[in-house]
Amino acid sequence: MDYFFKSPIDVDLHLDNEEERTFVDYEFEQGRKDKAPIYESDETVKGTVMIRLKDGRKLDHDGVKIEFIGQIENTYDKGNIHEFTRSVQELASPGEMRHAQMFEFEFKHVDKPYESYIGKNVKLRYICRVTVSRKMKDVIREKDLWVYRFENEPETNSLIRMDVGIDECLHIEFEYSKNKYHLKDVIIGKIYFILVRIKVQRMEVSIIRRETIGTSPNQYSNSETITRFQIMDGNPNRGETIPLRMFLNGYALTPTFRDVNKKFSVRYYLSLILVDEDQRRYFKQSEITLWRRRDEHE
């Protein structure tokens, strides 16, 4: 019975200059890894589709088309897929195919309004999909693209200054040099101990990624610690200042995404954590904005 359902053709989808592009490795599903060529947001997507017949047989088909699709998928709800862009090109009208054929396609400056993203519970994908329509089962081939969106240097970039305090026990001031960082940037700051009347065991700074899906009241958030950096071990002295320097390059970071197509957001936070000798934790979080600079693609 399997013979009757095997595809009578091989379909090869090739993107122009694919071999010369930089690829992104990603985990498409748990345990299933893949890679995709990087495209810029305003770049034309073009290539070829090669259809080869098997065993010298002919192919009766109801048309051949290629689609460029941008979609958002909630991974905890497999059926919840939202398309935010779609372009279609007809490659062949219904008819008969007796030999191998190659078709060219071009989606000129096709709309790519968001950056590609695969998170814990949401995926934003761009797909080229070829469909050979038949009276029996359609033959479909897909290829993912990975889209980067580059930004200019922010016009404003404010100093972050906050404090952590417990009445008559602890007072700490800390500051970071700015609140917006490109993905290869360095976080520079300092922590100043004004009052210390508890036994401090250690102090850490963490980068937290918070992924939020949906809108209130049907909203779901997931937080993960990207990295944890211990900046102090042992009890500090009053008046002591501890410098902070964290290099972002090398961590799996994305730009900040805010309300993408009203479906999800991805935000980043710097979390200062202080642990005393009784393992009590005192912490303060501050949101930072991450953005992609053009030279990060080079």
UniProtKB/Swiss-Prot annotation:
The UniProt subunit note reads as follows: Component of the retromer complex which consists of vps29, vps6, vps35, vps5 and vps17. Component of a retromer subcomplex consisting of vps29, vps26 and vps35.
Gene3D superfamilies for the chain? 2.60.40.640
Question: What Gene Ontology cellular component terms go with this record?
Answer: cytosol; endosome; nucleus; retromer complex
Q: Which GO terms describe its biological process?
A: intracellular protein transport; retrograde transport, endosome to Golgi
Sorted alphabetically, the keyword list is: Protein transport, Transport
Q: Which organism is it from?
A: Schizosaccharomyces pombe (strain 972 / ATCC 24843)
- Return the similarity comment: Belongs to the VPS26 family.
* Known function: Plays a role in vesicular protein sorting. Required for the endosome-to-Golgi retrieval of the vacuolar protein sorting receptor pep1/vps10. Component of the membrane-associated retromer complex which is essential in endosome-to-Golgi retrograde transport. The vps29-vps26-vps35 subcomplex may be involved in cargo selection.
Give the InterPro entries listed for this entry.
Arrestin-like_C (IPR014752), Vps26-related (IPR028934)
Q: Name one Pfam family in it.
A: Vps26
Q: Which PANTHER family match?
A: VACUOLAR PROTEIN SORTING 26 RELATED
Q: Does the keyword Repeat apply?
A: no
- Name of the protein in question: Vacuolar protein sorting-associated protein 26
